[in-house]
């Protein structure tokens, strides 16, 4: 047995008595001490600034103490433009909380940004703070677990872009367009004496894009069940207008937008799950029963329930994020130019003889209903230019990457770097509003692509509408087809003119928008007057 000597026994008298020791302190004193300690730790955290590679670009002066460059979220384009203008090299650094970000600009930096293998797009997602997926953590469907570095998400989108699937669902998409546009004369206030009316393209075209995308990328049941579709429209609309990226800058500050993103993502999950479960259960032991839709492709691949639902939530959000707005943009702008409408109509009339017998009578719209996929994709070059110009002018956003390597990445021609562990960001307006590539860049002119400037022909990645470099839009085939279908049906069925809410003709409207805000919108007070062609 150990023999403890008196001088080795610690004095424990501090634990007893009423006048000394921590245990004798009042609860209030303990609470204040804890609060003071926590506050001190928090202030140290706020004051701490991580070290940055000395070769990183200089920091922009457009910053707020402790938070960083809030303008990245609140003034998306003007913050970027002004920071580039103040930089000697066109590159600049800024903080978002404790996250170091390098803003890059110019052709060489853009190519580096889009091509470098160590700049990861998915791991940079937290900087955006938009959409239904809250990251981190990154869900399995978005991780590069497939061949060639593809994710489950990319692999399944590519499956849905195959000709067999698009052709099999084409009629569902064209039928939806015809139904929506045909409903205009009866659903809208008609003008006396003519088969015409007035419509705001925003809501009608937005809902059309949503219903088409669900039929192409999910299943018919969601659209055909009115109550379910209305819920889907409402939840998606909320998510489209929520931005909680500032949680990167102020993670210690509660965020209502962040909470709402989680909530509406949960509501979509609850909406989609029963439909997927029903399909999975219906396939058990029934080899002969197979639906003809995207959900069936996922089920036939043996995909798990959670992966299917997560994929569907993400793919539908992405597929309508730009198309939902662009459909209204295209119609709104086309109203102001009858010459462009005539060019589209000429392409329609030139396309129908390719597949429709000359001796078989039919209206132009009936012929469109029977147009095969290969004709849709090859017969409308001017329509494609209109779409391209609409994307150039109306799809503006900051792209982000994370340097996941252990080495700094040189920014060509600057002597500066994107440090290891730092984010890189690029604003698409840097290319799309470049006067050297696009003269008078704020003027909508699809014909500029017919005779592009030499710089626009040769500059690498001068157009970013469908992504570029290592991250091209894997769903662009459907996106182009969908926008083409809607524009072609609109022109085939009606003549269009721009007007106010009372049907009075409007002079040309400036369709520029506030590029600083998230979720930009169409010009307000602009309506479309339509007159039936047939």
Swiss-Prot record:
Disulfide bonds: none annotated. It is found in: Membrane. CDD domains: cytochrome_P450 (cd00302). The chain crosses the membrane at residues 30-50. Keywords: Glycoprotein, Heme, Iron, Membrane, Metal-binding, Monooxygenase, Oxidoreductase, Transmembrane, Transmembrane helix. Gene3D superfamilies: Cytochrome P450. Its cofactor is heme. It is a single-pass membrane protein. Pathway: Secondary metabolite biosynthesis. InterPro entries: CYP450_sterol_14alpha_dmase (IPR050529), Cyt_P450 (IPR001128), Cyt_P450_CS (IPR017972), Cyt_P450_E_grp-IV (IPR002403), Cyt_P450_sf (IPR036396). It is an enzyme of class 1 (oxidoreductase). One of its GO terms (cellular component) is membrane. Heme binds at residue 473. It holds the Pfam family p450. One of its GO terms (molecular function) is monooxygenase activity. Glycans are attached at residues 6, 145, 403. Its EC number is 1.14.13.-. Cytochrome P450 monooxygenase; part of the ergochrome gene cluster responsible for the typical purple-black color of the ergot sclerotia. The ergochrome gene cluster produces several ergot pigments including the yellow ergochrome secalonic acid and its derivatives, as well as the red anthraquinones endocrocin and clavorubin. The pathway begins with the synthesis of atrochrysone thioester by the polyketide synthase (PKS) CPUR_05437. The atrochrysone carboxyl ACP thioesterase CPUR_05436 then breaks the thioester bond and releases the atrochrysone carboxylic acid from CPUR_05437. Belongs to the cytochrome P450 family. This is Cytochrome P450 monooxygenase CPUR_05419.
